[in-house]
Amino acid sequence: MTHLYNGMSTTAGDLLYPNPGRLLPGMTSVNGEFQVPRHVLRPDSIVICDSVRHPRRVRYQVPAKYRAVAHALAHPGTTLTGFGALALYGLPHLVDAHDTVLISPTLHAKKRGSTFEPALVRKQLEPEELWQMECRGELITVVAPPVAVVQALQLIRSRQCAWPVLASEDEEAFVRAVQLVDASRRFLALTPEAIAVAGKGRVNNRWLASVLKASSALAESPKETEMRLIAQEVARQFGLKLEEQVEFWANGKLVTRADLAFPEARIALYYDGRHHDDASTRLRDTSIDLYLTSINWRPLRYGTNMLSGLVGHLEVVLRERGFVKVDEPPSLSGWL
């Protein structure tokens, strides 16, 4: 978890090299002033996939934190906002596919972002909403973390920033918003109260309140958030309790921590990221599953592109274990 404070420093500028007007060996351009080593670039497959949902199909190979510092240093007197600010604060998820947006007090006309240029806008901010960050021996101005979250939520709600989620079209923005708030709470230690204060006058209060109510500080990834929102619908249908980060102990030792669990039905849910594909991790997962089965728990594991089957799997297992639906679930927008 990142410790955030006004005046903090960032190492994101350490890999920036002056752009001499030609591409140096092993480097790629960030903008007209800076280059970064190619080894930091995002995988082509992910970049292409993300660009499909960008409003102008812009492809961003350079991670957001490097673009953020490069553009801020190249545009002195501006303020870094939204997803770019969150990337610089250390948010590890959801930030890399979007424009870097700078607020310029002298701007006459809004400018769109592109692969090598930031978006430029003109907005008013209160003095207490501005932080200073040291980078490469210089100070850059960045919006305070809660304000950055709210600015990102504005872009999500207006569908200017999107990524794939399992939800109906009218509920997609809500799911993405909860994912962003979850990540901000988990990795940046932001509170719902601070986000709510920053949201006044910027985002619809009722919508923001529903997002904050549905959020959690325990989700370790956006996909885990997505899994929780789906599982909550099933829990409501069956009148069951859903818990997060449930620990299992044996002989005084922690055996596993399930991402989610239905205690009454003894079902444990896991979202397994890419690191679970290596042999040693798979072996450990198998050992955990065998232990859970031995104590009459049913482990269910999900990975990339597998969450669409979660509802059906849960319903089958719950019925096998003697549970029946007690209510039809409200939609996610029922929180609105």
Predicted regions and their residues:
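Surface segments flanking catalytic/ligand-binding clefts of nucleic-acid enzymes
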Residues: G7, R185-L336
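Short gly/ser-rich loop at a beta-strand->alpha-helix junction or flexible surface loop bordering the NTP-binding
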Residues: M1-G201, G334-L336
